[in-house]
Amino acid sequence: MKLKGRKIVGGKAEGEVIVSRKPLSFLGGVDPETGIVTDAESDIRGQSIAGKILVFPRGKGSTVGSYVIYALKKNNKAPKAIIVGEAETIVATGAIISDIPMVDGVDVSKLKTGMKVRVDADSGEVEILEDGE
């Protein structure tokens, strides 16, 4: 199955999905040294986003969150790609300065943790390769 969205940052990535059903704040919500989600309100608290395809409805929080995404990339703890239901400037800026493929406008309810997907951000497409859990 292919899901259609909109390119925010071009590029391609393939890998395992980790899904948060709640908005995600990077500042204070993700440890830039480890890639572990630390936000007490997050449904993926304690899990690593490093090397995964990160899926969530939208970002929240401070503009400094963009630099947390950049620090994740510099520390080799960033996600391979970001898929959001609705892009906002904090996450989009972080993905742009970190060169992380990003797509928005995707029906994130169709994705679940453990799936394997291919993201073609250039065309705005997300292809589900394996169903996961």
UniProtKB/Swiss-Prot annotation:
One Gene Ontology molecular-function label: hydro-lyase activity
Signal peptide extent: none
Disulfide bond among keywords: no
Entry keywords, A to Z: Isoprene biosynthesis, Lyase
GO terms for biological process, alphabetical: isopentenyl diphosphate biosynthetic process, mevalonate pathway
HAMAP family: PMDh_S
Designated name of the protein: Phosphomevalonate dehydratase small subunit
Organism: Thermococcus kodakarensis (strain ATCC BAA-918 / JCM 12380 / KOD1) (Pyrococcus kodakaraensis (strain KOD1))
